[in-house]
Regions:
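Short, structured active-site "lid" loops
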Residues: 47-74
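A conserved helix-loop-strand patch within extracytoplasmic ligand-binding domains
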Residues: 79-82, 88-142
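Short, well-ordered beta-strand segments
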Residues: 6-8, 75, 93, 126, ...
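Small-molecule-sensing regulatory modules
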Residues: 2-39, 44-48, 52, 138, ...
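Paired acidic/hydrophobic, glycine-rich loop segments that form the ligand-binding mouth/hinge
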Residues: 56, 73-77, 165-170
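Short acidic active-site motifs
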Residues: 62-63, 115, 154-155
Length: 318
Protein backbone atom coordinates (compact mmCIF):
# COMPACT_ATOMS: atom_id res chain seq x y z
CA UNK A 1 0.00 0.00 0.00
CA UNK A 2 1.44 3.36 -1.03
CA UNK A 3 -0.59 5.91 0.98
CA UNK A 4 -0.73 5.45 4.76
CA UNK A 5 -3.95 3.92 6.06
CA UNK A 6 -6.15 6.44 7.85
CA UNK A 7 -7.28 5.11 11.23
CA UNK A 8 -10.30 6.69 12.88
CA UNK A 9 -10.13 6.84 16.68
CA UNK A 10 -11.54 8.78 19.59
CA UNK A 11 -9.16 11.35 21.02
CA UNK A 12 -9.05 10.15 24.63
CA UNK A 13 -5.75 8.92 26.03
CA UNK A 14 -7.00 5.33 26.23
CA UNK A 15 -8.50 5.37 22.72
CA UNK A 16 -5.23 6.72 21.30
CA UNK A 17 -3.30 4.02 23.12
CA UNK A 18 -5.55 1.38 21.58
CA UNK A 19 -5.23 2.89 18.11
CA UNK A 20 -1.44 2.88 18.46
CA UNK A 21 -1.55 -0.81 19.33
CA UNK A 22 -3.24 -1.34 15.96
CA UNK A 23 -0.71 0.96 14.29
CA UNK A 24 2.15 -1.11 15.70
CA UNK A 25 0.58 -4.34 14.48
CA UNK A 26 0.19 -2.87 11.00
CA UNK A 27 3.77 -1.61 10.99
CA UNK A 28 4.98 -5.13 11.77
CA UNK A 29 3.41 -6.03 8.42
CA UNK A 30 5.14 -3.13 6.70
CA UNK A 31 2.02 -0.95 6.53
CA UNK A 32 2.21 2.73 7.47
CA UNK A 33 -0.78 4.48 9.01
CA UNK A 34 -1.92 7.77 10.49
CA UNK A 35 -4.52 8.62 13.11
CA UNK A 36 -7.65 10.71 12.52
CA UNK A 37 -9.14 11.72 15.87
CA UNK A 38 -12.75 12.38 16.87
CA UNK A 39 -14.79 13.60 19.83
CA UNK A 40 -18.01 11.61 19.93
CA UNK A 41 -21.38 12.46 21.43
CA UNK A 42 -20.48 10.43 24.51
CA UNK A 43 -17.27 12.45 24.89
CA UNK A 44 -19.10 15.77 24.66
CA UNK A 45 -22.10 15.18 26.93
CA UNK A 46 -20.24 14.45 30.14
CA UNK A 47 -22.85 16.11 32.35
CA UNK A 48 -25.47 13.42 31.66
CA UNK A 49 -25.65 9.75 32.68
CA UNK A 50 -25.01 7.46 29.72
CA UNK A 51 -28.29 5.66 30.29
CA UNK A 52 -30.33 8.86 29.83
CA UNK A 53 -28.73 10.09 26.60
CA UNK A 54 -30.48 7.26 24.81
CA UNK A 55 -28.65 7.29 21.48
CA UNK A 56 -26.95 4.23 20.01
CA UNK A 57 -23.26 4.38 19.28
CA UNK A 58 -22.49 7.13 21.79
CA UNK A 59 -18.76 6.54 21.39
CA UNK A 60 -18.68 5.21 17.83
CA UNK A 61 -21.15 6.92 15.48
CA UNK A 62 -18.94 9.79 14.32
CA UNK A 63 -16.16 7.34 13.43
CA UNK A 64 -18.58 5.12 11.56
CA UNK A 65 -20.07 7.98 9.55
CA UNK A 66 -16.68 9.05 8.20
CA UNK A 67 -15.60 5.46 7.60
CA UNK A 68 -18.67 4.90 5.45
CA UNK A 69 -17.92 8.14 3.55
CA UNK A 70 -14.37 6.98 2.83
CA UNK A 71 -12.75 9.71 4.94
CA UNK A 72 -10.93 6.99 6.89
CA UNK A 73 -9.89 3.46 5.95
CA UNK A 74 -10.63 1.73 9.23
CA UNK A 75 -11.88 2.59 12.70
CA UNK A 76 -10.58 1.33 16.04
CA UNK A 77 -13.07 0.89 18.87
CA UNK A 78 -13.41 -0.62 22.29
CA UNK A 79 -15.65 -3.50 21.24
CA UNK A 80 -17.94 -3.05 24.24
CA UNK A 81 -18.85 0.42 22.87
CA UNK A 82 -19.98 -0.91 19.48
CA UNK A 83 -23.71 -1.63 19.08
CA UNK A 84 -24.38 -5.25 18.17
CA UNK A 85 -25.99 -4.29 14.86
CA UNK A 86 -23.42 -2.81 12.48
CA UNK A 87 -24.41 0.07 10.19
CA UNK A 88 -25.00 -0.94 6.56
CA UNK A 89 -21.73 -1.28 4.69
CA UNK A 90 -19.51 -1.77 7.74
CA UNK A 91 -18.20 -4.91 9.43
CA UNK A 92 -15.97 -5.78 12.36
CA UNK A 93 -13.14 -7.39 10.43
CA UNK A 94 -10.94 -8.22 13.41
CA UNK A 95 -10.54 -8.13 17.15
CA UNK A 96 -7.09 -8.12 18.70
CA UNK A 97 -6.04 -10.53 21.43
CA UNK A 98 -8.10 -9.64 24.46
CA UNK A 99 -6.77 -7.81 27.49
CA UNK A 100 -8.07 -8.77 30.94
CA UNK A 101 -11.87 -8.49 30.55
CA UNK A 102 -12.66 -8.07 34.26
CA UNK A 103 -13.80 -5.01 36.16
CA UNK A 104 -11.67 -3.72 39.02
CA UNK A 105 -12.28 -1.85 42.25
CA UNK A 106 -10.27 1.31 42.88
CA UNK A 107 -10.32 2.58 46.47
CA UNK A 108 -9.40 6.03 47.73
CA UNK A 109 -6.09 5.80 49.56
CA UNK A 110 -7.73 6.92 52.78
CA UNK A 111 -9.86 3.77 52.95
CA UNK A 112 -8.32 0.67 54.45
CA UNK A 113 -9.40 -2.46 52.63
CA UNK A 114 -8.83 -4.91 49.82
CA UNK A 115 -12.34 -5.64 48.53
CA UNK A 116 -15.92 -4.42 48.22
CA UNK A 117 -16.66 -6.07 51.55
CA UNK A 118 -14.26 -3.69 53.28
CA UNK A 119 -16.06 -0.49 52.24
CA UNK A 120 -17.85 1.22 55.15
CA UNK A 121 -21.65 1.44 54.96
CA UNK A 122 -22.80 4.44 52.96
CA UNK A 123 -19.58 4.73 50.95
CA UNK A 124 -19.96 6.47 47.59
CA UNK A 125 -18.89 4.26 44.68
CA UNK A 126 -18.55 5.90 41.28
CA UNK A 127 -19.66 4.39 37.98
CA UNK A 128 -21.61 5.48 34.90
CA UNK A 129 -22.63 1.91 34.02
CA UNK A 130 -26.04 0.49 34.90
CA UNK A 131 -24.50 -3.00 34.76
CA UNK A 132 -21.90 -2.09 37.38
CA UNK A 133 -24.49 -0.23 39.45
CA UNK A 134 -26.84 -3.22 39.53
CA UNK A 135 -24.13 -5.72 40.43
CA UNK A 136 -22.75 -3.39 43.10
CA UNK A 137 -26.14 -2.93 44.76
CA UNK A 138 -26.88 -6.65 44.49
CA UNK A 139 -23.64 -7.24 46.42
CA UNK A 140 -23.76 -4.27 48.81
CA UNK A 141 -27.17 -2.60 48.97
CA UNK A 142 -25.86 -0.37 51.77
CA UNK A 143 -23.53 1.51 49.43
CA UNK A 144 -24.36 4.68 47.50
CA UNK A 145 -23.80 4.75 43.73
CA UNK A 146 -22.50 8.06 42.38
CA UNK A 147 -22.52 9.00 38.69
CA UNK A 148 -18.91 9.06 37.47
CA UNK A 149 -18.20 10.20 33.91
CA UNK A 150 -15.03 11.19 32.09
CA UNK A 151 -11.97 9.45 30.73
CA UNK A 152 -9.98 7.01 32.85
CA UNK A 153 -7.45 9.54 34.26
CA UNK A 154 -10.32 11.89 35.17
CA UNK A 155 -12.16 9.15 37.05
CA UNK A 156 -9.00 8.10 38.88
CA UNK A 157 -8.41 11.73 39.87
CA UNK A 158 -11.92 11.97 41.31
CA UNK A 159 -11.21 8.92 43.48
CA UNK A 160 -7.87 10.39 44.62
CA UNK A 161 -9.55 13.71 45.48
CA UNK A 162 -12.19 11.96 47.56
CA UNK A 163 -15.18 12.97 45.44
CA UNK A 164 -16.07 9.29 45.67
CA UNK A 165 -14.72 6.70 48.08
CA UNK A 166 -14.21 4.15 45.31
CA UNK A 167 -14.84 3.50 41.63
CA UNK A 168 -15.36 0.51 39.39
CA UNK A 169 -13.49 0.54 36.09
CA UNK A 170 -12.36 -1.87 33.38
CA UNK A 171 -9.08 -3.63 34.08
CA UNK A 172 -8.12 -3.41 30.41
CA UNK A 173 -8.10 0.38 30.40
CA UNK A 174 -5.90 0.62 33.47
CA UNK A 175 -3.54 -2.03 32.10
CA UNK A 176 -3.18 -0.29 28.74
CA UNK A 177 -2.49 3.04 30.42
CA UNK A 178 0.07 1.50 32.76
CA UNK A 179 -2.05 2.40 35.79
CA UNK A 180 -1.96 -0.98 37.54
CA UNK A 181 -1.01 0.68 40.83
CA UNK A 182 -4.53 2.10 41.22
CA UNK A 183 -6.16 -1.35 41.26
CA UNK A 184 -7.31 -2.51 44.69
CA UNK A 185 -8.80 -5.82 43.55
CA UNK A 186 -10.20 -7.60 40.52
CA UNK A 187 -13.90 -8.49 40.39
CA UNK A 188 -13.97 -12.09 39.22
CA UNK A 189 -16.47 -13.98 37.08
CA UNK A 190 -18.99 -15.46 37.36
CA UNK A 191 -19.90 -13.58 40.55
CA UNK A 192 -19.25 -10.28 38.75
CA UNK A 193 -19.57 -10.08 34.98
CA UNK A 194 -18.12 -7.47 32.59
CA UNK A 195 -19.79 -5.96 29.56
CA UNK A 196 -19.97 -8.13 26.45
CA UNK A 197 -16.73 -7.70 24.52
CA UNK A 198 -14.98 -5.84 27.34
CA UNK A 199 -11.19 -5.80 26.97
CA UNK A 200 -11.26 -6.40 23.19
CA UNK A 201 -10.12 -3.88 20.57
CA UNK A 202 -12.24 -4.00 17.41
CA UNK A 203 -11.20 -3.02 13.89
CA UNK A 204 -14.08 -1.88 11.70
CA UNK A 205 -13.84 -1.56 7.90
CA UNK A 206 -16.10 -1.11 4.89
CA UNK A 207 -17.44 -4.49 3.83
CA UNK A 208 -16.56 -3.90 0.16
CA UNK A 209 -13.00 -2.67 0.74
CA UNK A 210 -10.85 -5.34 -0.90
CA UNK A 211 -7.70 -3.37 -0.13
CA UNK A 212 -8.06 -2.82 3.62
CA UNK A 213 -10.29 -5.76 4.55
CA UNK A 214 -7.66 -8.50 4.14
CA UNK A 215 -5.10 -6.43 6.03
CA UNK A 216 -7.48 -5.92 8.95
CA UNK A 217 -8.45 -9.59 9.01
CA UNK A 218 -4.79 -10.56 9.28
CA UNK A 219 -4.79 -8.95 12.76
CA UNK A 220 -7.70 -11.02 14.04
CA UNK A 221 -7.27 -13.18 17.15
CA UNK A 222 -9.57 -16.18 16.63
CA UNK A 223 -10.10 -17.22 20.29
CA UNK A 224 -11.06 -13.66 21.19
CA UNK A 225 -13.36 -13.37 18.17
CA UNK A 226 -15.20 -16.59 19.06
CA UNK A 227 -15.65 -15.48 22.66
CA UNK A 228 -16.97 -12.02 21.86
CA UNK A 229 -19.28 -13.30 19.13
CA UNK A 230 -21.03 -15.43 21.76
CA UNK A 231 -21.14 -12.59 24.29
CA UNK A 232 -22.53 -10.08 21.81
CA UNK A 233 -25.12 -12.55 20.52
CA UNK A 234 -26.31 -12.97 24.12
CA UNK A 235 -26.52 -9.19 24.48
CA UNK A 236 -28.37 -8.79 21.20
CA UNK A 237 -30.84 -11.59 21.97
CA UNK A 238 -31.79 -9.78 25.18
CA UNK A 239 -32.18 -6.51 23.24
CA UNK A 240 -29.55 -5.00 25.51
CA UNK A 241 -27.44 -1.88 25.35
CA UNK A 242 -26.12 0.71 27.77
CA UNK A 243 -29.68 1.11 29.10
CA UNK A 244 -29.84 -2.49 30.35
CA UNK A 245 -27.78 -4.03 33.17
CA UNK A 246 -26.41 -7.02 31.23
CA UNK A 247 -23.07 -8.77 31.60
CA UNK A 248 -21.49 -11.62 29.66
CA UNK A 249 -18.16 -13.42 29.56
CA UNK A 250 -16.87 -16.47 27.71
CA UNK A 251 -14.23 -18.27 29.77
CA UNK A 252 -11.90 -20.96 28.40
CA UNK A 253 -11.69 -24.23 30.33
CA UNK A 254 -9.59 -27.38 30.04
CA UNK A 255 -12.31 -28.96 27.92
CA UNK A 256 -13.63 -26.01 25.90
CA UNK A 257 -15.30 -22.86 27.16
CA UNK A 258 -18.17 -21.65 29.32
CA UNK A 259 -20.44 -18.72 28.57
CA UNK A 260 -21.65 -16.80 31.63
CA UNK A 261 -24.45 -14.25 31.42
CA UNK A 262 -26.51 -12.05 33.72
CA UNK A 263 -29.27 -9.49 33.60
CA UNK A 264 -30.52 -7.38 36.49
CA UNK A 265 -32.93 -4.62 37.29
CA UNK A 266 -31.38 -1.21 37.88
CA UNK A 267 -31.71 -1.46 41.66
CA UNK A 268 -29.88 -4.79 41.80
CA UNK A 269 -32.78 -6.27 43.75
CA UNK A 270 -33.28 -8.94 41.11
CA UNK A 271 -30.46 -10.63 39.22
CA UNK A 272 -30.83 -13.58 36.84
CA UNK A 273 -27.68 -15.52 36.01
CA UNK A 274 -26.84 -18.51 33.86
CA UNK A 275 -23.95 -20.52 32.43
CA UNK A 276 -23.80 -22.89 29.47
CA UNK A 277 -21.12 -24.76 27.55
CA UNK A 278 -19.96 -22.60 24.64
CA UNK A 279 -20.08 -24.25 21.23
CA UNK A 280 -17.07 -22.72 19.48
CA UNK A 281 -18.46 -23.95 16.17
CA UNK A 282 -21.60 -21.84 16.63
CA UNK A 283 -20.80 -19.11 19.15
CA UNK A 284 -23.80 -16.94 18.24
CA UNK A 285 -26.15 -19.87 18.76
CA UNK A 286 -24.67 -20.36 22.22
CA UNK A 287 -25.34 -16.72 23.05
CA UNK A 288 -28.96 -17.02 21.91
CA UNK A 289 -29.41 -20.26 23.87
CA UNK A 290 -28.19 -18.63 27.08
CA UNK A 291 -30.42 -15.60 26.50
CA UNK A 292 -33.44 -17.85 26.00
CA UNK A 293 -32.55 -19.78 29.16
CA UNK A 294 -32.45 -16.55 31.17
CA UNK A 295 -35.70 -15.32 29.62
CA UNK A 296 -37.37 -18.43 31.01
CA UNK A 297 -35.91 -17.74 34.45
CA UNK A 298 -37.05 -14.14 34.81
CA UNK A 299 -35.13 -12.02 32.29
CA UNK A 300 -38.30 -11.24 30.32
CA UNK A 301 -39.93 -9.81 33.44
CA UNK A 302 -36.85 -7.68 34.14
CA UNK A 303 -36.88 -6.32 30.58
CA UNK A 304 -40.59 -5.55 30.80
CA UNK A 305 -40.01 -3.75 34.09
CA UNK A 306 -37.29 -1.64 32.49
CA UNK A 307 -39.65 -0.73 29.65
CA UNK A 308 -42.37 0.31 32.08
CA UNK A 309 -39.81 2.46 33.89
CA UNK A 310 -38.87 3.99 30.50
CA UNK A 311 -35.31 2.69 30.60
CA UNK A 312 -36.02 0.79 27.36
CA UNK A 313 -37.91 1.37 24.11
CA UNK A 314 -40.73 -1.00 23.25
CA UNK A 315 -39.65 -4.13 21.34
CA UNK A 316 -39.84 -3.78 17.57
CA UNK A 317 -42.05 -6.17 15.54
CA UNK A 318 -40.16 -8.72 13.48
Amino acid sequence: MSAPLRIGTRSSELALRQARIVQAALLERGIESELVTYRTLGDKRLDEPLSTIGAKGLFTKELEVDLRKGKTDLAVHSLKDLPTDSPPGLIVAAVLEREDPRDVLVLNRGIMGQSLDDLPRGSRVGTSSLRRRAQLLATRADLEVAELRGNVPTRLKKVDEGRVHAAILAAAGLHRLGAHQHITCYLDAPAWLPAAGQGAIAIQVRDDDDRVGPVARSLNDLPTMLAVRAERAFLQALEGGCQVPIGALAVPTDHGALLHGMIADVSGSRVVRGTIDLDVGEPELSGVRLANQLRGEGASEILEGLRRAEHLPAPQPE
